[in-house]
Amino acid sequence: MRKDYLMTPGPTPVPAEVLLTMAAPIIHHRTPDFSAAFAESIAGLKYVFDTEGDVLLFASSGTGVMEAAIANCFCVGDTVVVCRNGKFGDRQKQIAEVYGLNVVDLHYEWTSVVDPADVATALEENPGVRGVIVTQSETSSGVLNDVKAIGAIVAEYPETVLIVDSITGIGAVECKTDEWGLDVVMTGSQKGLMLPPGLAACTVSKKAWRAYARSTLPKFYFDWMRYQKNVEKDTTPFTPAVSLVLGLNVALKMIREEGLENTIARHSRLAEATRRGCEALGLKLFAPPEGRGSAVTPVWVPAGIDGKAIVKMMKSEYGVTIAGGQDDYAGRIFRVGHLGYFGDFDIITTLAALEMTLAKLGYEFERGSGIKAAESVFMEG
């Protein structure tokens, strides 16, 4: 018998309370019971998004809600600034181009943060920009971009919306939607919300609704107004993922019980323990010190070691599933997720499995040093 540990940045582990709720007999979505759970879920999402504005919930992946943001805010030929320093910034650019937008491309290495000064310059040099699109927590690289600073810049442009991909940010890092002037913020269920994949949500500010009013891009399933009119009646325009919504309600109540500030602090502690543990093993962190998020820790594979073998052996021999690198970094980095339903001993277990794996693969280090470093973080409180 072996216990498995899912230590990826998505999907993430699902609490037993949520699983039990989703395993209950299905209910119809046009009933008072579902409407009550749906209304509570919307209220809970507003809590984790830290917004008093509108929140919409979709049966889709995170990519779906990314596409929805573009389809609802722009017209063919509109100019948008896309900030990209990872795979999901790249995806935003691809979606924008598919919809016929003119992209001002702020492209950085995956190991770099987006510079807010570059956003300011792009807005100054390109009059009439209708949107700025940026990833807050870049899942592929572990980089955390300063959307607060970018929000302050975009706020000076009344016709420019700021769209933020916080799919691995919400619930893991601070994201003050209203206070920071973020017009559209997106997340997915399989990340910090502690659910299986299948739901995605976004905020819509008053400025974003003004952008919607002028948008002429085609939309049907992802038409924001269809959802908003139904949210006001505690229902959905189309058949929802009923069991996922019921599970979402439970998961959001768990976050409320812990308290959002405490939830974010827990993620920060888990991330710091993971980073210190890896560094104690002599491993190099991928994300720069000035921009490390709390959702995932990417680590360079040491010279002479097969990166894919690390991922494979940790799963096959120790039941610990971590993620490999993506695109050009496949086999060159591995990624440890600590996003959502994780505690201190998940990190200890993962570092123990990593140590044993590295030792078997011939990497030389002081055995136990990674675990000891992580324990020090947890004992510091």
Listing of model-derived features with the role each one plays in the protein:
Residues 3-59, 63:
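A glycine-/small-polar-enriched, mobile loop at the entrance of the PLP active site in fold-type I
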Residues 284-317:
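Conserved PLP-binding catalytic core of the aspartate aminotransferase-like
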Residues 328, 332-381:
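PLP-dependent enzyme catalytic core of the Aspartate aminotransferase-like
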Residues 52-81, 85, 89-93:
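Conserved beta-loop-alpha segment that forms the PLP phosphate-binding cup at the N-terminus of a helix
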Residues 178-190:
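Conserved active-site segment immediately N-terminal to the catalytic lysine
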Residues 13-14, 190-280, 381:
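Active-site C-terminal subdomain of aminotransferase-like
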Residues 114-171:
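Active-site phosphate-binding strand-loop segment of PLP-dependent enzymes
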